[in-house]
Design a protein with these regions (language model features):
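Acidic, low-complexity terminal tails and accessory targeting/binding regions
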Residues: 1-10, 93-105, 147, 152, ...
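Phosphate-coordination/substrate-recognition cap region in phosphate-metabolizing enzymes
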Residues: 2-7, 46-113
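Short, hydrophobic/glycine-enriched beta-strand segments
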Residues: 11-17, 157
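General small-molecule cofactor/ligand-binding pocket signal
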Residues: 13, 83-85, 201
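Active-site metal-binding loops of divalent metal-dependent hydrolases
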Residues: 18, 160, 206
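Loop-to-helix element that buttresses phosphate recognition and phosphoryl-transfer chemistry
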Residues: 19-74, 124-139
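Short glycine-enriched, charge-decorated loop/helix-capping segments at active-site entrances
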Residues: 27-35, 99-101, 120, 217
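Short glycine/proline- and acidic residue-enriched helix-loop micro-motifs
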Residues: 111-133, 225
Length: 225
């Protein structure tokens, strides 16, 4: 690849998967393979239509069903094949997976408090990932994928936690900093990638959805949990 092309920025459309029943229930999915619900399938079709004319040359997706189903809609709209990458999976939540926020608070109150306060070193029991380990994974994978497409536009379909990591990387924010930005289902998040890293262009675009999108995370400033 010519050296001058290597310096060209990559446009990244980072897209969170559509809604699932467990999103509605505030039940932790993590690495569990939960499909989109009917609304999520509709959201996937809407986000696909929204990005169909963006000139996407590559689609990368988490292998988990909720992300892959969203990617399939985008692939149908653009004619671009999907490349699955396990590095784009959601954070591994160990024993928290399958439980609601309230159930976690009742079963593991001390661990739940460390999680809610974004302790970077806290990892849920049962092979869960700490925020620091998860962040390093997400940024490394996203950097590898974006660096392979200088001067192009790519789509990464992934999860709320991955979107949060990309926002923090692009904004140079501390991992423990409280979250005030949205991570809505089927939202479009726009970044540029250069050899210097990621830059934020636009965030949480849900203009293609009627009535916005669900952000059920428990760590956002002003959230109920």
């Amino acid at each position: 690849m010519p050296a001058d092309l290597m310096d060209e920025p990559t446009r990244v459309l980072a897209i969170r998967h559509g809604e699932t029943a467990w999103n509605v229930d505030t039940r932790i999915q993590g690495h569990l393979d939960i499909p989109l619900n009917d609304k999520g399938l509709w959201q996937a079709s809407r986000v696909a239509a929204a990005v169909a004319e963006e000139g996407i040359t590559a689609i990368y997706s988490s292998d988990l069903m909720r992300a892959y189903q969203t990617a399939e809609a985008i692939s149908r709209a653009t004619g671009v094949p999907i490349v699955s990458d396990t590095g784009l999976r959601e954070r591994g939540f160990g024993e928290f997976e399958g439980f609601t926020y309230q159930e976690i608070a009742e079963r593991w109150p001390e661990e739940a408090e460390r999680w809610r306060k974004r302790d970077p070193e806290f990892a849920p029991r049962g092979a869960g990932e700490s925020i620091r380990v998860f962040y390093d994974r997400c940024v490394a994978v996203a950097t590898r994928l974006a660096a392979a497409h200088p001067g192009e536009t790519i789509a990464m379909i992934s999860h709320g936690g991955v979107m949060d990591c990309l926002y923090r990387a692009a904004s140079r924010l501390d991992l423990a900093a409280p979250r005030s930005w949205l991570l809505g289902n089927a939202s479009i998040n726009r970044l540029l990638h250069t050899p210097g890293g990621f830059t934020l262009i636009g965030w949480s675009d849900t203009s293609h959805l009627e009535g916005g999108a669900l952000d059920e995370s428990n760590d956002r400033v002003g959230s109920a949990a």
